[in-house]
Amino acid sequence: MQASQFSAQVLDWYDKYGRKTLPWQIDKTPYKVWLSEVMLQQTQVATVIPYFERFMARFPTVTDLANAPLDEVLHLWTGLGYYARARNLHKAAQQVATLHGGKFPETFEEVAALPGVGRSTAGAILSLSLGKHFPILDGNVKRVLARCYAVSGWPGKKEEIGRAHV
């Protein structure tokens, strides 16, 4: 299957069945997309929505998150699990505040350098909020690609991921 055919089929599917009204999809900003992407790691959408809404109500900007005590961030995160994500969010927000003047970085290298942000998350932030063209290789994307292109082995293996990022 040609890449153009594949992308057309995926976009058609998204037009018919995709979610388009999630809280982080409305008025997309790098901060909102980043927050949602981190919360969605290993966590279902339905679980994330109320946490995302609470975080946005309490920390409407990355600077607000950076200036909050870590204990408050962890308290709002309670129940979401994988607390390293919350600690990394806080550290990354502090870096954005100090190194970038509170403006979320807009280059792949700068975003990927933030604590807790890997290549896929950096790609998602820049693609979904700014329309830049970077791959997003989360578990769902890897499964779809593996099925469509008959990838042998688990698509989460490092060598498969490396090929996909080429």
Located regions from the model:
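Catalytic cores of DNA base-excision repair glycosylases
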Residues: 2-4, 9-165
